[in-house]
Amino acid sequence: MNSLIRLTGDFQTARGSRPGPATLPAKGTVTAERISHIRKSLETVLSKWPKDAIIEDILVSVEYRQIVAKSNRIKEMLNGGKDSEPELSIRGARYLDFNGNHPRHLMTHYVPEATIRSTISKLRECERIVVDYFDGLMNADKMVDLVKNDKLKQKWNPAVSHTLTRSGFAQLIRDSYYVNEFRIDKPPAATDENAIVTLFETERDPQDLFEELHIDVSPANLLENSVLLTETEYRTLLERAPYLVAMSVIDLSSYAPMSDEGSASPAISSLPEYPTDEPIIGVIDTPFEEKYPPYFSNWVDYRSCLPEDIHPTSSDYRHGTCVSSLIVDAQAQNPSLDDHCGHFRVRHFGVATAGKFSSFTVMKHIERIVAENQDIKVWNISLGSMEEVSRNSISPEAALLDKLQQKYDVLFVVAGTNSDNGKPAYLGSPADSINALVVNAVNRNNEPASYTRRGPVLSFHHKPDLAYYGGDKGDTITACCGTGAYPAVGTSFAAPLVARKAAYLIYKMHLSCELAKALLIDAACAWTTPDDMDRLGYGIVPVQIEKILETSNDEIRFMLSGVATERENYNFNFPVPVSGATYPSVARATLCYFPKCNRNQGVDYTDTELDLHFGRIGNDGRIKSLLPNNQGEEDCTTDEEKARKKLRKWDNVKHIAEPLTSRSKPKKVYANPMWGMMIRKSSRYQKGSHDPQRFGVVVTIHNLKGENRIDTFIRQCSAIGWMVERVEIDNELKIYEHSQVEVEFE
């Protein structure tokens, strides 16, 4: 078996080119009538906006003609000048008709009335110019002429217009091509239960808004722009200020109850009575059984977060105790799932009782717990909602996990939630967390379990990430609670088994959270992407940790970490072994990163995009990537919808691979025999484009001749400046053990 290789080296950087003048697509046209329609829709917004609104500015939504890239969003419309550009006024984004024939963006902006009136005036002037100077219609050729015609340039001001610049006119034409109309969006419907309501971000403090609306909201029920409201309070808000409401979800979460069928049996284990220096995994779940402590209780540091007036019953303890039992000692009760990861300590936080509970309350607990326990790098959450997640916004619970993961450099392993009636259902929160490692369940036949729910989330983000064994009817997982071993079924019990592997990689193999996630996904996917990615994610994780950290002798697997700081981040020095004039190999690569996220942006939730290109370097100097991808190139013709669906644009996991089949053939070697990697970085916001973004990449190369070329690869990497390290399991374990020794100074 070949060990995993860690490469350490520098990526070169280059800034992207500045955008050129505003243009139209080759066959695109904009008529004076279209401009007039857009202007009138904006005038309607002004007339319909409540005169007694309790916020200073106006929330106006722009409907685009399609799913638009950042470069095709409005730039002249709703432009309030420096530091008031349209991208800074966005307060929400969602899709219209995403699964229909005409998917498109709807974005909500928060702008002063003066900015809207200014846009109306500019559109009126733009319409006049199109009629007077361009025969009532603009097309791509006229837009080019507008830039290159020196005579037109010289006479523009004041002959053509003294209020609208030539570049401003051109940008208005481009904006008009992509915009359908403006409007005031409708708020979400009322609910019959308590709801977590998110307000649009304005200059007003949410607490002050509720006081002015005479709605009594406790500060304890506020979390940033989200608030927990009763059914009556929410209806009052919709009656008095519906324009404030960005999104809402029911405040009820649960977990699929464990079956009462079967009975507990004595637990059998050789677990040492007390732990020593084993890694700690955090568990946030129902209470841990202390009245009848299970055999592994010395390995669990339990801390109750429940109010003192709540007295849990025996059923309240079962779920959380069973989850922790699998983390501590899963192999004892499930020999066929022995992952060779050893034992783990658990710091267990009881935040909910059996059945339904307030997800808002749990959110408040999670935020505090993670902040106060920063020594824990891996957290398991097997609680979730029975309600399906929204297609247009991330859940509040998932948004919190994404924020905490990015802020504290931790990894959440989250259960994919269960269907309780056998009917297909989308995932429940917080399994829509983008940064978390979301785990669904399979049976022993490697098929989705009968209760498995499905992704994607936000209409196109791949979730779940992975699948693992969670038991099913007649073939359960064995967990332990206070009364002994117990038959368990659900994603709740698949997740902790994956959390063990993640913790092993992060604590004992010294991998970053990004690399641990990438390595698990790469190993699960292998050379075959599942047909049912909506339920299986990228595949089923191998049982034994060696299958993740080692490869067969005809494969080379290496990993590297970096920080993307500029538009282009590249290294063209990967010496993939050559045989004669060919590369007798196929390859795959997996990129993971944890971007900052903004729930207020709706479907445009992630702030940063990293686009992965890896492959041979052609004679033109470009990377011939494993997945054909010309995003970022001058000849790019990929539209935003295809980029999101096919190339995973804005998804924080990128997996690209060549197929490995009996028909796979060696590839040509070009003038430069090296392979290259390019990571193109872009931001939702122009001002955020230089913020650094950490990433991890795992690459696997399979030799079609069955040859072991790892020594050649290591030797060549060292010769060209890479720092090369074999990740030997035994060596890494010794390093971990030595790091846990306490040194006493006299």
Where are these regions (language model features)?
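Exposed low-complexity, polar/acidic, P/S/T/G-rich flexible segments that act as propeptides
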Residues: 584-624, 682-746
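Protease zymogen maturation seam
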Residues: 5, 158-160, 164-195, 204-279, ...
